[in-house]
Amino acid sequence: MQYRSKNLPIILASQSPARVELLKRIKITPAQIIPADIDETPNLRESPNHLATRLAYEKATKIASQIEDSAIIIAADTVTALGRRILPKASSAEEVRYCLNILSGRRHRVYTGLCIIKKDKDQLVTRQKIVQTVLKFKRLSEEELNFYCSLDEGIDKAGGCKISGYAEAFISFISGSYSNVMGLPLFETVNSLNSLGFISYK
């Protein structure tokens, strides 16, 4: 597999270590990591899938407007939801517990909005995807909740849990992309890059 499209550099509009690791799995190392500073507050009555799609687009377009050189910008946003109830990105152990109490024993969805922009001089070509994965957590005991909250790995994670960490042991059912739950759906990422002429298998 080779990468082409005028050797345009990849810019990842995220400081997520998980997304960097996922890109490495498909043999991509970003030339730059530029986090997009945007307001991630959901709009009134905004659905989880619309929120993830909108935020990914806003991240990608913000970086595209900031850079002068040609590049391919990859942006994503992950949202965990129970029905239409959007769970926060946990900022404390208390919020981690709040999220896990909601998810305990319940089937829920993780949405990742993906937006890839190819900026070549003043021309922008955009690819957008929204991917959902259905999960069910086991019913968590108080001891399990206490233990997980003590790990701090759910801090700054959508829905208060790091699916590639200990929280993976809570999953009793999953349907859909695992990489999507980690923060970047690889199937859709590769297909989008391929449609932009970035990937060649020759």
Swiss-Prot record:
rRNA-binding as UniProt keyword: no
Record key words, sorted: Cytoplasm, Hydrolase, Nucleotide metabolism
Cytoplasm found in the keyword field: yes
Cofactor: a divalent metal cation
EC number: 3.6.1.9
GO cellular component: cytoplasm
Catalyses which reaction(s): a ribonucleoside 5'-triphosphate + H2O = a ribonucleoside 5'-phosphate + diphosphate + H(+); a 2'-deoxyribonucleoside 5'-triphosphate + H2O = a 2'-deoxyribonucleoside 5'-phosphate + diphosphate + H(+)
Subcellular localization(s) per the UniProt record: Cytoplasm
Active site per database record: 77
Enzyme class: hydrolase
Gene3D superfamilies to which the protein is assigned, alphabetical: 3.90.950.10
Pfam families (UniProt xref): Maf (PF02545)
Molecular function via GO: nucleoside triphosphate diphosphatase activity
Biological processes annotated in GO: nucleotide metabolic process
Alphabetized InterPro entries for the sequence: ITPase-like_fam (IPR029001), Maf-like (IPR003697)
UniProt cross-references to HAMAP family, sorted A to Z: Maf (MF_00528)
UniProt function note: Nucleoside triphosphate pyrophosphatase. May have a dual role in cell division arrest and in preventing the incorporation of modified nucleotides into cellular nucleic acids.
Family: Belongs to the Maf family.
Protein name (record): Nucleoside triphosphate pyrophosphatase
Organism: Rickettsia bellii (strain OSU 85-389)
